[in-house]
Amino acid sequence: MSNNENIFIRAMKKGDIDSVNAIIEACVMGWDLPERVKRLSLGSYRYTEHDLDHLTAVVAVMTGNGIVGIATWNFTAAEDLPKNQHGMQLHGLYVAPRHQRRGVGSRLINCALEAAREQGMEGLTVKAQSDATGYFQSRGFTNLPVENEERDYPHRLWLAV
């Protein structure tokens, strides 16, 4: 485990984009998908300066290591939430592979949860990569049912604040 005192969370800056995208690439390339699929989809996971106009983005910085993780979120559509709930969607959560299992992801999720609370939301939803659902479930997220197979992403999860 890392010492959480050596990790601080701050707003992502435009100058962080290259470091963040390197972390995203390392994470995506480790997913349980065919190599061709990872290469073809990687571009859709990378962030640009324009994304910072539409998402809240924070980075986890570890003393002596620089940026080791990122989380982004925004408000989400009602059809992606449990009925009669208001929430935010965790758009992205990535931790550099060599810093995983050290509490960085939990710190980033807690930051998003706090933002949801501050905005008067009831929870946080995420559309997870299939092999990441266990991680989110271990953090208290629960699966949302697929009500419309043509529209609903199959790995949607919810965590009430």
Describe the role of every protein-language-model region:
Residues F8-A22:
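A short beta-loop-alpha structural element at the N-terminal edge
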Residues A116-Q129:
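Conserved GNAT acetyl-CoA-binding A-motif
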Residues T125-K127, T142-L159:
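Conserved catalytic-core motifs of GNAT/GCN5-like acyltransferases
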Residues G66-F75, Q89, Y94:
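Conserved beta-strand in the GNAT
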Residues T76-H91, Q100, E150-Y153:
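A conserved beta-turn-beta hairpin within the catalytic core of GNAT-like acetyltransferases
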Residues T48-V59, Q89:
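A short helix-loop-beta-strand connector motif used in the catalytic cores of GNAT acetyltransferases and
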Residues N21, E25-Y47:
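Conserved GNAT-fold acetyl-CoA-binding loop/helix
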Residues V95, R101-E114, S138:
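Conserved acetyl-CoA-binding loop-helix of GNAT-fold acetyltransferases
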